[in-house]
Amino acid sequence: MIGKLTGTLLEKNPPEVLVDCGGVGYEVQVPMSTFYNLPASGAKVSLLTHFVVREDAQLLYGFGTHSERQAFRELIKITGIGPRMALSVLSGMSVEDLAQAVTLQEVGRLVKVPGIGKKTAERLLLELKGKIGADTGAQSLFVNNDQNDIVQALMALGYSDKDAAAALKKLPPDVGVTEGIKLALKALAK
């Protein structure tokens, strides 16, 4: 219903901010990653929002980027993950880190987030696989096009994205595509 707010930032009390839009003050919950990038009070601010209506409350959640809002929306679709927990996840790690954790299926990174236990982390990884890591993490996980080409080649050969990314970690950072594929195949053969 409310997709974006643009106005004057009146107050900053983590994780909540107050934004004045044409004389109406909106209380908006934001992840810490967005909070740290906000301007000083009194400055103009623009936030992408997600509006949640519950029986006892109507809440606005704000985000600095489209990828943050999309990650939030994917997180709240998961059983047992509400808006507060999703905000906690996005406050505990960047969208890129979350996408990388999903791509590499790293439970350990998610359990570091307050309120996320091992079972919840495993459920998150299972349900987010293919939704968040595919478009967000693939871009941030690979530093350059050569690395991306190496991973794509390995996946075309039938290796999973997790195996391909693990093999990529073992390669020198400046390796070319041809040599990188050869070295990655040797690493995967072991």
UniProtKB/Swiss-Prot annotation:
Location of the region described as Domain II in the Swiss-Prot/TrEMBL record: 65-143
Q: Which UniProt keywords apply?
A: Cytoplasm, DNA damage, DNA recombination, DNA repair, DNA-binding
Q: Does the keyword DNA damage apply?
A: yes
Q: Where is this region: Domain III?
A: 148-190
One Pfam family, short name:
RuvA_C
Sections of the chain in a coiled coil: none
Q: What is known of its domains?
A: Has three domains with a flexible linker between the domains II and III and assumes an 'L' shape. Domain III is highly mobile and contacts RuvB.
Query: What is this protein's name?
Result: Holliday junction branch migration complex subunit RuvA
